[in-house]
């Protein structure tokens, strides 16, 4: 048993040794094979890397050679350009030197010629001085006097020629514009017809008997005082039979007083408390009538979108007048004229009619009386959001501001047409006479005027001049100067025609 165990152990040991020897031998062979393969692969990789590096080197070398060649080419081109520029500069320098030499020669020649000219000028001055002395001796005039006479002669000749040119231009303008302007204005006037009103500051209230007059006066005049205090109207009770005079510059107040008196007389109860009650009631009625009149006017004219306060102002125009012409009728007439004229000129007739109706709203309000009515009307229109062109037409229709819209001259012309229409307006006698005298005196202030006559109610001024002081050409200048001075210094409705008359009479006697 023991022998068997020992033999087994010995066999195991011998087998292990043999196995170790065989394993070691096989591992070595495998190691050698792997090593050979690694060496072979390394050799291949080495060759490949060497080839790759060599290829990159060759490529970089080729690129560098190209870049060097390109740089050399650019350098060569730059050198060629530089050489060309040097050649051009050299040529220019030679040309400059040549021109400088020519300029020096020309300068020397000019200096020589200037010397000759100076000598000749001195000789001419001497000759001219001698000739002037001879002419002065022959004519008896100095050189300055002769110059003055020549200048005056040339001035007169220039004035005559200028006036002739002006006349030709004006005649041509009249021929081309007069027919069309007359057609538009005449057609506008013919298509508009309104009634005429008379300005007055008093209203006569008719009564049936003096008994009623006494009741109106009241005990110790208390009814009269109450009525005057309530209406702001002066009530004149005199010996005029069956009449009481209501005096006030405000037509609305007079109308309120008239209507209140009518109701009091009709009712029969006349005492201070009743007077105050009736006046308050009538004032409310008149205010309602004013608004109704404004609305009716805008509807008749086809004007919409007006501010209520502007409608009220238009209604109050019924009780206002200017130079005897009812303000509302004047505004309606101007509005219709503006619409017709705007249509003829290809403009918006509705806007023109609106501007024409509103152009005199500045005459109605009592505030800011120091402002001209055109500017006050423009402020009111701006306040109540009217369009800028309409506001400008209102403010510029008397030339207080510059006209910036096409509506402005239309409103100005139509306002003048309405005011200048025969029978449309009247003036106070004193103001009328004063205006005629001012017209005549203004024309008399010009030299050469001998007489002046204002005719046709001041719409024409005839100026008679001395034939020995003013010639035919100067008469036209004089008429223009007088017209301009009248425009600048005087206020008048419509237009004034200035006619200058120059008459020469030769009288001889046969014996």
Curated annotation (Swiss-Prot):
Residues 327-420 form the HD domain. Its main location: membrane. Keywords: Cell membrane, Endonuclease, Hydrolase, Membrane, Nuclease, RNA-binding, Transmembrane, Transmembrane helix. The keyword Transport does not apply. The chain crosses the membrane at residues 3-23. It is a single-pass membrane protein. One of its GO terms (cellular component) is plasma membrane. Endoribonuclease that initiates mRNA decay. This is Ribonuclease Y.
């Amino acid at each position: 048993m023991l022998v068997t165990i020992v033999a087994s152990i010995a066999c195991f040991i011998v087998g292990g040794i043999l196995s170790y020897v065989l394993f070691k031998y096989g591992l070595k062979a495998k190691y050698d094979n792997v090593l050979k393969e690694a060496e072979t692969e390394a050799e291949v990789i080495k060759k490949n890397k060497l080839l790759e590096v060599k290829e990159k080197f060759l490529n970089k070398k080729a690129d560098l050679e190209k870049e060097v060649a390109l740089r050399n080419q650019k350098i060569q081109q730059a050198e060629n350009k530089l050489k060309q520029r040097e050649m051009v500069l050299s040529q220019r320098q030679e040309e400059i030197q040549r021109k400088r030499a020519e300029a020096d020669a020309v300068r020397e020649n000019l200096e020589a010629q200037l010397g000759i000219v100076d000598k000749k000028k001195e000789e001419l001055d001497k000759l001219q001085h001698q000739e002037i002395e001879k002419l002065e001796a022959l004519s008896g005039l100095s050189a300055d006097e002769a110059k003055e006479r020549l200048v005056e002669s040339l001035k007169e000749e220039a004035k005559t020629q200028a006036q002739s040119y002006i006349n030709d231009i004006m005649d041509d303008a009249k021929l081309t514009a007069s027919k069309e302007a007359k057609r538009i204005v005449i057609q506008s006037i013919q298509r508009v017809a309104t009634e005429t009103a008379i300005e007055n500051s008093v209203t006569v209230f008719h009564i049936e008997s003096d008994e009623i007059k006494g009741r109106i006066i009241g005990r110790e005049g208390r009814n009269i005082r109450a009525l005057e205090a309530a209406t702001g109207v002066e009530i004149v009770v005199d010996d005029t039979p069956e009449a009481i005079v209501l005096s006030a510059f405000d037509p609305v107040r007079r109308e309120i007083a008239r209507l209140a008196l009518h109701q009091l007389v009709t009712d029969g109860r006349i005492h201070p408390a009743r007077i105050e009650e009736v006046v308050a009631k009538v004032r409310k009625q008149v205010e309602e009538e004013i608004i109704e009149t404004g609305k009716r006017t805008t509807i008749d004219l086809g004007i919409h979108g007006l501010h209520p306060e502007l409608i009220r102002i238009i209604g109050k125009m019924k009780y206002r007048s200017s130079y005897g012409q009812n303000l509302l009728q004047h505004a309606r007439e101007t509005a219709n004229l503006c619409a017709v004229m705007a249509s003829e000129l290809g403009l918006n007739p509705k806007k023109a009619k609106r501007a024409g109706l509103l152009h005199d709203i500045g005459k109605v309000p009592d505030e800011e009386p120091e402002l001209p009515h055109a500017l006050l009307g423009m402020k009111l229109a701006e306040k109540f959001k009217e369009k800028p062109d309409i506001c400008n037409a209102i403010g510029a229709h008397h030339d207080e501001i510059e006209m910036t819209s096409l509506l402005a001259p239309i409103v100005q012309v139509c306002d003048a047409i309405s005011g200048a229409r025969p029978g449309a307006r009247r003036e106070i006698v004193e103001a009328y006479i004063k205006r005629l005298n001012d017209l005549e005196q203004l024309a008399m202030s010009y030299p050469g005027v001998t007489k002046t006559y204002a005719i046709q109610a001041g719409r024409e001024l005839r100026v008679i001049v001395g034939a020995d002081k003013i010639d035919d050409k100067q008469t036209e200048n004089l008429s223009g100067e007088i017209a301009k001075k009248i425009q600048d210094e005087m206020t008048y409705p419509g237009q004034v025609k200035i006619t200058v008359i120059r008459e020469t009479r030769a009288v001889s006697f046969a014996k």
